[in-house]
Amino acid sequence: RQGAAAAIIVHEEEPAAYPWSVVENSWQGPQLDLQRDDLGAERVILESWIRDHVLDDVLKFTGFNYLALKEIALEKTFSPFPFRGLTLSSEIFNKVRYLQSHNIGAIKHGRTKPNEYILFMAHWDHLGKVKAVKPGDDIIFNGAVDNATGVASILELAKRYSEIDTERSVIFLAVTLEESGLLGSEYFAKYPPIDLSHVVSGFNFDAILP
């Protein structure tokens, strides 16, 4: 946290390669996280986003603009400084619910080196639903590319590997909640069912285009 009370991400469409609507759809409604021992105390109190041109409007009162500030922030000697006359206040009401999701995995045991592993993985989640803009619009983010193609890849690999012997063991893992911040992968890394130091190679499949 480095002493920060809040973290606000500035969205620029060109370098991000996705429009503001993706941010809106991802950050409206419930936000998911792992159940942590410190109950999230390591996170800042406020996490938010702002569009670059909206930030420019806000900064008019300070004598700065976003591009100038970005150049300053990229300098090796940069250190934080306050904006005179600019403050932020926010009021948040939230509720906590406990839900359960799953990583799904399978293992093919190796013939001569069963304690060494090749890992194939892909995330199975996507973004859920969006509010319809027009009547009759598809409200489901189907996720054919991100990431049904990735999951299909590890399923096909599992099918092919089931037909042959392998020297090392092979793990096929479909992780949850990638779109919420790689949470399924984080859980696997934190509570691995195997010794991760014995994973000799890993392949992640995400957004494979036809």
Label the predicted regions:
Residues 1-39, 43-44, 109, 117, ...:
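Extracellular/luminal Protease-associated
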Residues 21-27, 69-74, 187:
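Generic hydrophobic, helix-prone segments enriched in Leu/Val/Ile
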Residues 36-143, 156-159, 163, 167:
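Soluble metallo-hydrolase cores and metallopeptidase-like ectodomains found primarily
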Residues 25, 56-61, 187-190:
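Charged/polar, solvent-exposed surface patches and flexible loops
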Residues 5-10, 46-50, 105, 117-121, ...:
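Structural recognition of the beta-strand scaffold that forms the well-ordered cores
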